Amino acid sequence: MIEEKKELKKRRVLQMARFYGAAAFTLITMRLISRAIKVRKCNVPSIFQQNYKLPPFSQRNEAMSALTYASAASIGTFSTLIFGFCWALDISTAREFVFKTREFMSLPQALETDTSMDEETSKLTKQLQDLLSSENNK
């Protein structure tokens, strides 16, 4: 029983660390986006600069920057959402996620899934397992 409590605590700490890591990534990304918007929004010329000419910029770099920021923001937001959901429902693996989802939707639980393979696939799987086990033994 004590081992189960330790394992549960370890599992919850890992879930918490994943959530807080994703949240920190999201907050840092949003801060960088805010700073990038402020820099691009206001162009105040210095004392001897012309005020009717825009500073030179590369459209390609602007597009790459926007794509990078948007991708990082969406990845951070969705990872925070997913890790928070999994932390709240105590889900650590994909198998547990499938189990909880089926339970939530009142679908019957399939204990044994159909994992039958044809001959070629089973041979290839066995060869890969042998290769990986021989690499681990070195």
Swiss-Prot record:
It is found in: Membrane. This is Altered inheritance of mitochondria protein 11. The keyword Transmembrane helix applies. Belongs to the AIM11 family. GO terms for cellular component: membrane; mitochondrion. InterPro entries: AIM11. It comes from Saccharomyces cerevisiae (strain JAY291). The chain crosses the membrane at residues 17-34, 67-89.
